[in-house]
Amino acid sequence: MTWSYPVDPYWMVALKALLVVVGLLTAFAFMTLIERRLLARFQVRMGPNRVGPFGLLQPLADAIKSIFKEDIVVAQADRFLFVLAPLISVVFALLAFGLIPFGPPGSFFGYQPWVINLDLGILYLFAVSELAVYGIFLSGWASGSKYSLLGSLRSSASLISYELGLGLALLAPVLLVGSLNLNDIVNWQKEHGWLFLYAFPAFLVYLIASMAEAARTPFDLPEAEQELVGGYHTEYSSIKWALFQMAEYIHFITASALIPTLFLGGWTMPVLEVPYLWMFLKLAFFLFFFIWIRATWFRLRYDQLLRFGWGFLFPLALLWFLVTALVVALDLPRTYLLYLSALSFLVLLGAVLYTPKPARKGGGA
C-alpha cells in the first residue's frame, strides 16, 4: 500500500532545512549538558551547575572555550584532509534528520512536518550513514599518528560487522510495508500496529547497531581513551575536535528519532492525537536509554565487538529477514509474525537469564 503526500514549495523546504540545522546544533549543545547531569546523577554527583542558573549556560561556556583554544595542526598531518575530515562527519550527520516525519501531513502551519520526503528514504538513510565513516577514516589517515590511524581502522572494520545486521534489520519493516518511504512506514503502523510487535529481533538488532553506529558505549572503540589516547581525534583540538563531538551527538539524536519512527509508530499513538508530543517523548526516551547504557555498561574489546557483530547481530537479522520474506512471499497472515516475534522475545530473554557464567580462573569460589 502506498500513500500520497503534498509537496512543499522550495522556499519552505529551505526554511525547514535551516530550522533542522539550527535545531540540531542547539540540541547538541544542550545534550552535552543533559548527558553530564544525568551521568552525574547515576554516579551520585551533582554535575555542572555553576555557569548560569542551574548550569544552563554551561554549553555556552564550553563553546567559547573550544573556539578560543589553540588550533594545532601537527607537522606530519595532511593539512587538507585534516581539516576536511571533521566537516565530512558533521555534514553527513546532518543530512539524515531531514527525512524524519514528526507529524501528519499539513500539520506544520499548513506545510509538511519533514524537510524532504523520498520514496527511497531507507536507502538514502543507509547510504548517508555509511558515508559518515569517511570522516573518521580520513581523520586517522591524515593525522600522521598511529593512535589515530588505529582508531579509524577500528571504526572501518567494526562498521562491516554491524552494518550488515543493521541493513538486514531495516529490510524487515520494508518487506512488511512494501515501501522504502518513512511516511509510508509510519502510516502502516498507524493502521496495523507498531512494527516492534511484528519484528522484535529486527528492532533489537537495529537498536544495538544504532549504538555502534553512533560510537556510543559500549561500542565507543574508535576513541577508546585507555587504549588509543582518544582514538581518531587524538591530534585534533579547538573547533575541529568540537565538530567531531557535534557529529557524534547528532548521530545519537538521529538514531533516537529513527528507532521510534521505524518500529514504534513514529508520531502515532493509540490514544490522544498529539503527534509532536508523542514523537518528542519517544525520542527523549531513547536519548535517556542511550545515556543510561553509557552510565552502567562497560566498553567491549575490539575482538568482542567483531565477534558479537558477526556471531549474533548478523545471524539474528538474517534469520528474521528470511522469516519475514517467507511470510510475505506466501501471503500468510501477519499474525504469524506477531506470534513468532513474541516467541523470539521469550527465547532471547531465556538465553540472557539462563546462560551459565564462565568459571573463574584459578578455581576460586
From Swiss-Prot:
GO cellular component terms attached to this protein's record: plasma membrane
Whom does it interact with, and what assembly results? NDH-1 is composed of 14 different subunits. Subunits NuoA, H, J, K, L, M, N constitute the membrane sector of the complex.
Which Pfam families does the UniProt entry name for this protein?
NADHdh (PF00146)
Kindly list the biological process annotations in GO that this record carries. Answer: aerobic respiration
Q: Which organism is it from?
A: Thermus thermophilus (strain ATCC BAA-163 / DSM 7039 / HB27)
EC number, UniProt record = 7.1.1.-
The catalytic activity, as recorded, is:
a quinone + NADH + 5 H(+)(in) = a quinol + NAD(+) + 4 H(+)(out)
Q: What is its subcellular localisation?
A: Cell inner membrane
- Coarsely, its chief localization is membrane
Record's PANTHER family? Answer: NADH DEHYDROGENASE SUBUNIT 1, NADH-UBIQUINONE OXIDOREDUCTASE CHAIN 1
The protein's name is: NADH-quinone oxidoreductase subunit H
Family statement: Belongs to the complex I subunit 1 family.
Q: How does it sit in the membrane?
A: Multi-pass membrane protein
Decide whether keyword NAD is in the record. yes
Keyword Manganese appears in the UniProt entry: no
Q: Which residues form the signal peptide?
A: none
Q: What class of enzyme is it?
A: translocase
Q: Which residues cross the membrane?
A: 11-31, 80-100, 120-140, 157-177, 192-212, 252-272, 273-293, 310-330, 336-356
